[in-house]
Amino acid sequence: MLMPKRVKHRKVQRGRMKGKATRGNFLAYGDFGIQATTCGWITSNQIEAARIAINRYIRRGGKLWIKIFPDKPVTEKPAETRMGSGKGSVEYWVAVVKPGRVLFELSGVDEEKAREAMRLASHKLPVKTKFVTRRDFEEMGGEE
């Protein structure tokens, strides 16, 4: 499971997700990827499930990059606990995802195989996604 080794603050506020992704919104490493079209929290377990789904499908064919990291702690209080007595303990970690964020990148396989692998991975994720290729970003006006 992905989680930070050390954090500055053990517990953080929930916050809100506004706007589109301004960073991590283009393909940096691979030829294919999946890009979020809605916002949401993706847990470390969901990232791992998607990674396994992709790797099982492509076998030893290509290279996979995970472009998101769960760095936000989510706290929960135990069941049937009265209100008050402080914030709950950290239960799991999430990555905050905004529309436009590239979640996974893949190279070393053909487009048809990459499309199916990303489709399988997208079923494991709580956000809507779309399949993107390097060609899509070159048509839009280049990369950084």
UniProtKB/Swiss-Prot annotation:
Q: Which SUPFAM superfamilies match?
A: Ribosomal protein L16p/L10e
| Taxonomic superkingdom | Bacteria
Biological process annotations from GO: translation
Q: PROSITE patterns, alphabetically?
A: RIBOSOMAL_L16_1, RIBOSOMAL_L16_2
Keyword tags: Ribonucleoprotein, Ribosomal protein, RNA-binding, rRNA-binding, tRNA-binding
A GO CC term attached to the entry: cytosolic large ribosomal subunit
Q: Report the InterPro entries cross-referenced here.
A: Ribosomal_uL16 (IPR047873), Ribosomal_uL16_bact-type (IPR000114), Ribosomal_uL16_CS (IPR020798), Ribosomal_uL16_dom (IPR016180), Ribosomal_uL16_sf (IPR036920)
A Gene Ontology molecular function term for this protein is: rRNA binding
A Pfam family annotated for this UniProt entry: Ribosomal_L16
Task of the protein: Binds 23S rRNA and is also seen to make contacts with the A and possibly P site tRNAs.
Q: Partners and quaternary state?
A: Part of the 50S ribosomal subunit.
Give the protein family: Belongs to the universal ribosomal protein uL16 family.
> What's the name of the protein?
Large ribosomal subunit protein uL16
Whose protein is this, by species? Clostridium perfringens (strain 13 / Type A)
